[in-house]
């Protein structure tokens, strides 16, 4: 490697040589405007304001300390905050501790500087996020799905339709009724499926040593999507934790949201909707192993991977849509706490 070629990507541990990461406090998580699904995927996640203000005081924690925590016994709020922080750290690593626009503009240097070891580290962190998503999904009764790669090794990005009412949604945050909101609130199963697709993609391409510009653009967007989704859920449960005086676990639950549509993105960046097909349910009996690399399935299929809808006894109507005027309360519906 040419010793004269240098950028922050090559020295990704210079500023974070102890693998410390930034943990976002409640007040540093920005407000999110009402957005359509496409706006969430393409606009919001590309905004640096969705992350942190460099002038704000933040707490630091070692990433290895997070990975060593007993995730089974942590609260859902704690897991989501840590998951959000690890996802943000992955994005920082991918962007080379530098401005993302500069990174995107010079992919040739990225291919030179991003070594196999660094990619393996990102895979390790993504596997931790996947394992935590599985734990959280099981807590609220969401069905777990095993990712099955297609022949082209495409990355799958789901269509996230977060509830515009958020913590003010009467159809989700009701103490005496099961949630009836059709929009997304806690999407652990969906997130795990998408993260697993990125893990497989990284393992496959890192082994072959091939990442072209289109692939890196697509990978970059997927990582930012994961970061955005974890941030959204962390902010929502953090608010509930605060308003209920540490009783957010009661309101961390599943709802009959539509999880049937997923987008597979090929290397050219073109998105296509997956048709519903069969998918194997992952029936893991072991708890999530700490700091252990799980084997990724090599199963091939000619049918694109897809997610079947979660069914926990709710009767869904495809024509029933949450309307803002009926789903929002001016005052917190949990204000009695």
Curated annotation (Swiss-Prot):
Disordered: annotated span: 291-314
Compositionally biased region (Low complexity): 299-308
Name of the featured protein: Uncharacterized protein R203
């Amino acid at each position: 490697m040419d010793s004269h070629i240098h950028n922050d990507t090559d020295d990704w541990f210079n500023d974070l040589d102890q693998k410390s990461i930034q943990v976002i406090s409640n007040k540093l998580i920005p407000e999110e405007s009402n957005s359509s699904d496409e706006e969430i995927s393409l606009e919001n996640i590309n905004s640096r304001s969705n992350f942190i203000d460099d002038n704000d005081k933040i707490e630091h924690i070692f990433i290895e300390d997070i990975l060593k925590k007993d995730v089974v016994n942590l609260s859902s709020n704690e897991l989501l905050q840590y998951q959000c922080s690890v996802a943000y750290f992955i994005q920082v690593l991918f962007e080379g501790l530098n401005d993302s626009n500069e990174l995107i503009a010079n992919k040739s240097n990225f291919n030179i500087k991003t070594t196999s070891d660094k990619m393996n580290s990102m895979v390790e962190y993504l596997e931790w996020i996947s394992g935590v998503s599985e734990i959280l999904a099981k807590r609220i009764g969401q069905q777990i799905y095993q990712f099955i790669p297609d022949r082209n090794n495409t990355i799958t990005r789901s269509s996230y339709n977060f509830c515009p009412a958020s913590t003010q949604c009467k159809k989700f945050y009701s103490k005496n009724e099961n949630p009836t909101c059709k929009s997304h609130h806690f999407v652990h199963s969906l997130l795990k499926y998408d993260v697993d697709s990125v893990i497989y993609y990284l393992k496959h391409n890192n082994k072959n040593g091939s990442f072209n510009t289109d692939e890196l653009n697509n990978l970059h967007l997927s990582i930012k999507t994961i970061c955005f989704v974890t941030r959204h859920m962390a902010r929502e449960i953090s608010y509930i934790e605060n308003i209920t005086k540490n009783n957010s676990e009661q309101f961390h639950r599943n709802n009959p949201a539509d999880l049937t549509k997923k987008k597979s993105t090929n290397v050219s960046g073109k998105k296509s909707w997956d048709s519903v097909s069969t998918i194997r349910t992952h029936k893991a009996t072991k708890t999530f192993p700490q700091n252990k690399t799980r084997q990724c399935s090599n199963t091939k299929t000619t049918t694109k991977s897809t997610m079947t809808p979660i069914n926990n006894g709710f009767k869904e109507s495809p024509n029933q849509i949450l309307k803002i005027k009926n789903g929002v309360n001016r005052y917190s519906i949990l204000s009695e706490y």
